[in-house]
Structure formats: structure tokens, C-alpha cells
Amino acid sequence: MDMEEAGEAAQPAPLKVLVIDDHQAHAEGLAELLQLAGFDASYVQTGAEGLAVARERNVDAVLLDMNLPDMNGFEVCRRLRRDPDTIGIAVVFHTAQGSVPGARHEGDAFLTYPVAMSEVYAVIRASVERRRKRMAAFL
């Protein structure tokens, strides 16, 4: 193995992030910005799609809108937490509506827009790290 191959092998895989937001332009824009920042990002527009894709893609984190057309963010989070295949996913709620009672207790983090994308990236990374530590403590 040469130095270039060794460097590539040492690079961690990008974090997989799923944006769940019913506003297509917002969801698509967030996913694109996350990709530019080195995340493996995709998006869906409903809670049901989010639950299925989170499971299929084995994502590390979801950036979850509070208000979706088929279920609210709390319900999506609860379903992720009840499923042994998705319990380890970090949940970062996001909304433009200001504070949402209980959001900090349900998910791993809460963001209110407008927010700097650098903060979004940092919160996602920190939430994934905390979630992984919590999950490791239970194993």
C-alpha cells in the first residue's frame, strides 16, 4: 500500500445525513450544502419516507422538520427510537417557528432558523458523536 492509499484508508467515511422537510426547496438546498461540506446527504419530504430511507440507508443523523404533512417531528423521532435498527440515529430537529416545547428532550439537538450553516454542521457532528457514545454505553 502506498502513501496515497494509506491516506485514503485512514479517511473516515462521510457522515450520512437525511434531511426530512416538506418544503422541497429548503430540503434540497440543505442537502446540497451538507454535501458541499463533506456529508453524504439526501432528503425526503414526509415522515413516512424519512423512516423508510433512514432505515434503508443506515444514516448517522436526520435533520428533522417539526411540521410534516403526514406526522410531526416528535412522532418521527419516537418511531426512530423504538426501532432497534434506527435507535442509534442522531435526531436534530429544525424549525423556523422559534422554540418548540419538548423538542430538546425528544431529540439530540434543536436548531431554529435562520442559523449559520457552520453551526448546522457542528451540531450534526456533535450530535452523532454524543449518540454514538450513548449507544456504546448500552452495548
Feature map (PLM): residue ranges:
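Non-catalytic signal-transmission and effector/linker regions of two-component phosphorelay proteins
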Residues: M1-K16, S118-L139
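Active-site residues of response regulator receiver
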Residues: D21, D65, T95
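Two-component/phosphorelay signaling modules centered on CheY-like receiver
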Residues: Q24-S42
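Alpha4 helix (beta4-alpha4-beta5 surface) of REC/receiver domains from two-component response regulators
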Residues: E75, A96-Y113, M117-R125
